[in-house]
């Protein structure tokens, strides 16, 4: 992106310090991202409810529409992630290479977020076209631009690993606050009962959330700074061919390990999240009892609150890799405890608490560890691969949702899942066989017992931190920057 508009002082970052500042942490990485992250978290949970319960799209194409169009859209989304990574790596502006796209995404996310819900009434064909277009305008266009640039803020913020780790923690706090507290607890208790199936209320509520995202994303833009991009020499370097970047990425053992790590973790956690409702309804609790899922969510949120204060000091002392590996041992043990007694509320809650304690390091310091790997690849090859590497990261996340949903539904089908129904007496019958309950239990706690062990072992080979300080100094000297 080359534009005279970006040369204007009015668009300069409000940060001038070479070191990370307090206002950068609080405004750029905690408060700023919260608007777009809140909107995305709400959509991830409730957009499908709007499609099925408010618009009644389950009848379109005999039910095939809502099964096919999200999968096709995710394929489009995966492609646009790769394209966006390519574009970011070739962006040269005074404001950096990712921040300009963060600025552009602010109005785009707000407008397309509103379009998702302002579906015209009446003609069904028009509704279907509107849904397909608005869904892809948001996810494959606007939010892809935001998410790619947002995720690169930590890796591009500074080479100081301690400061970068601190930003990673603040960034993750914002994510957890939006999805783990507001969407998982406040929204279902206070907001959803008021919305019901009233389309106008849905439009007003979601439009407000979309509009809130605009000023907060602008705040994120103004209170972030790409110190690495703006280093001496970085902006003067010629663009590197995409094939060359891909070769650099996939010939580096640390990058391969971290992508495998992210893939395994994402598959396990995604299938677990999909199965949460089913586990609450059929194994641990009863159908829509209104308390089981909330209790599991609360237990999941408590360790995340504790982790705000504990994780980074421990990561500095023991190392990001080491702490994360130890965490995954607790992750596996906690899941195994739940697996042993999946119908006992007390035991499951204890197991979930232990499991979520173990998941703290991967939640809070992963992006800092990923940033170390990006620096290592730069040291090794002489050029950065931020955009294309992040596009692969995002593609894994995007593709996993569709694939994991398909895997979970296949497991349910093969185990003999029976949909709830109302009998002649007007009673809701929601009963599953032992094989179905066993399958649901495996997807909720069994799979993560296995992935926890695998990830703990895999991380033993990710010793990128060992020489990262030395490599960063060599990069600075190579770029003509004075060593601090």
For the regions a language model picked out, list residue spans one by one.
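Membrane-embedded alpha-helical bundles of multi-pass transporters/translocases
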Residues: 2-484
